[in-house]
């Protein structure tokens, strides 16, 4: 009997086989026809991939199968990617898929992705190279098919939004083997002419094969090198081509591209109206400022006018004269009042007035009073007043043998011999008469 080193169970054998398959085939691509398509309520997808000689079971679980962009069906040729494994419970050999696409588009998508990565690495799609669209384009070139809904939609939107724009259709094939070369030639001619403010490349929706002309490398390079802003509108919103990546702006549809190219005339009219109002307001403000400035300059000029200055000086002079006259009148009135007060006081001190008053008082004395005593008192008072008057009367001094001497030239009273010199003429007042004498001798 042969020696048995190790005896395996079915599960152990299947586990070893699974590990061997998964390590030997980590990821495989396989192309074939779909068969035995099953999609139960769990959402998982179960199919077989087959060719004329063989078939292999495949499974795609719900997290992946729910994102499929097509409906798997019997006989459909597909390209699948997955991991080779073994279902241990039944010992079934199968592939767990993570990607599934229709075989015809699969090769195209791989070629597209490889070219996109290469051009992107060159910086062909760098946002820094993108040009902005003109704000108010005057002439636009449209490269598209001359027939179909695309050009009609573009014309309709452009005319509705901005009728002033000039549109030039550059008719071209948008599908087929020669389409890419024709579009590239028209784009190069339009850009080099310098006649256009923007260039629109447009096409309606279609399959990947229908849109393949816009994945041409030479077309993408021509778009990226154009000096004129280029906007692309190719296929539907979910479709992306190399022309979209190279263009300055990518629009989801041709109609949206037309809206992006030109401003809305209604918004422009509204904006122009606002600008007009702002301009009118600014003009009125400037005019008001100019008028105010002119008024200020006029007032300053008027203030510096010599005639105005002289008139102002005359007014000030008249005012000063009036105030001086008032001041003089006030001083004169005050002096006259003081003079009247002094006159009244001097009149009250006059002995004659006092004597007259006393005499008048004597007339009204009561006869019943002791007349003799009263008369004596009044006589004594009268004698006192007379003596006081005589004491201050300079003529009384002269009457006693003295004389009043004045200088003849200035009538100055001479009190000291030092006030005169030999030869001076003096006027001498005597008790009776006056003498004019000349000084012969002067001694102190």
From Swiss-Prot:
Catalysed reactions, as listed in the record: Exonucleolytic cleavage in either 5'- to 3'- or 3'- to 5'-direction to yield nucleoside 5'-phosphates
GO molecular function: exodeoxyribonuclease VII activity; nucleic acid binding
Gene Ontology terms: cellular component: cytoplasm; exodeoxyribonuclease VII complex
Keywords: Cytoplasm, Exonuclease, Hydrolase, Nuclease
GO-annotated biological processes: DNA catabolic process
EC primary class: hydrolase
Superkingdom of this protein's organism: Bacteria
Location relative to the cell: Cytoplasm
A Pfam family reported for this protein in Swiss-Prot or TrEMBL: tRNA_anti_2
EC number: 3.1.11.6
Entries under InterPro entries matching the protein: Exonuc_VII_L, Exonuc_VII_lsu_C, OB-fold_nuc-bd_dom
PANTHER family (UniProt xref): EXODEOXYRIBONUCLEASE 7 LARGE SUBUNIT (PTHR30008:SF0)
Family per record: Belongs to the XseA family.
Subunit comment: Heterooligomer composed of large and small subunits.
Summary of the function given for this chain in its UniProt record: Bidirectionally degrades single-stranded DNA into large acid-insoluble oligonucleotides, which are then degraded further into small acid-soluble oligonucleotides.
Protein's UniProt name: Exodeoxyribonuclease 7 large subunit
Organism phylogeny: Bacteria, Pseudomonadati, Pseudomonadota, Gammaproteobacteria, Lysobacterales
Gene of this entry: xseA
């Amino acid at each position: 009997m042969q020696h048995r080193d190790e005896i395996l169970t079915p599960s152990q054998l299947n586990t070893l086989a699974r590990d061997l398959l998964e390590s030997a085939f980590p990821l495989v691509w396989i192309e074939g026809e779909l068969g035995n398509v099953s999609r139960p309520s769990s959402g998982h997808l179960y199919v077989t991939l087959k060719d004329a000689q063989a078939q292999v079971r495949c499974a795609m679980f719900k997290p992946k199968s729910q994102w499929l962009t097509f409906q798997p069906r019997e006989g459909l040729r597909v390209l699948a990617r997955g991991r080779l494994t073994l279902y241990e419970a039944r010992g079934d050999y199968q592939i767990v898929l993570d990607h599934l696409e229709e075989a015809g588009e699969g090769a195209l998508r791989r070629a597209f992705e490889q070219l996109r990565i290469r051009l992107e690495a060159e910086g062909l799609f760098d946002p820094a190279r993108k040009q902005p669209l003109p704000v108010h384009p005057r002439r636009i070139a449209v490269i598209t098919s001359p027939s179909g809904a695309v050009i009609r939609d573009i014309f309709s939107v452009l005319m509705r939004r901005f009728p002033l724009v000039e549109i030039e259709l550059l008719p071209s094939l948008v599908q087929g083997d020669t389409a890419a070369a024709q579009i590239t030639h028209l784009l190069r001619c339009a850009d080099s002419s310098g006649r256009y403010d923007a260039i629109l490349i447009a096409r309606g929706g279609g399959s990947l094969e229908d849109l393949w002309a816009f994945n041409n490398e030479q077309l993408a390079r021509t778009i990226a090198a154009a000096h004129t802003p280029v906007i692309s509108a190719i296929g539907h919103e979910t479709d992306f081509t190399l022309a979209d990546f190279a263009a300055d702006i990518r629009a989801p549809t041709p109609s949206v591209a037309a809206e992006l190219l030109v401003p809305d005339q209604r918004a422009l009219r509204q904006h122009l109206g606002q600008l007009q109002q702002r301009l009118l307001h600014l003009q009125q403000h400037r005019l008001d400022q100019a008028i105010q400035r002119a008024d200020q300059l006029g007032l300053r000029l008027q203030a510096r006018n010599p005639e105005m200055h002289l008139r102002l000086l005359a007014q000030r002079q008249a005012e000063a004269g009036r105030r001086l006259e008032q001041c003089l009148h006030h001083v004169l009135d005050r002096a006259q009042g003081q003079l009247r007060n002094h006159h009244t006081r001097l009149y009250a001190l006059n002995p004659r007035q006092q004597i007259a008053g006393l005499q008048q008082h004597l007339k009204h004395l009561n006869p019943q009073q002791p007349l003799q005593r009263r008369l004596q008192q009044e006589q004594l008072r009268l004698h006192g007043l007379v003596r006081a008057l005589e004491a201050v009367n300079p003529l009384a001094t002269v009457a006693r043998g003295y004389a009043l001497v004045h200088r003849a030239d200035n009538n100055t009273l001479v009190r000291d011999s030092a006030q005169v010199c030999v030869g001076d003429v003096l006027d001498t007042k005597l008790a009776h008469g006056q003498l004019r004498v000349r000084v012969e001798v002067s001694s102190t």
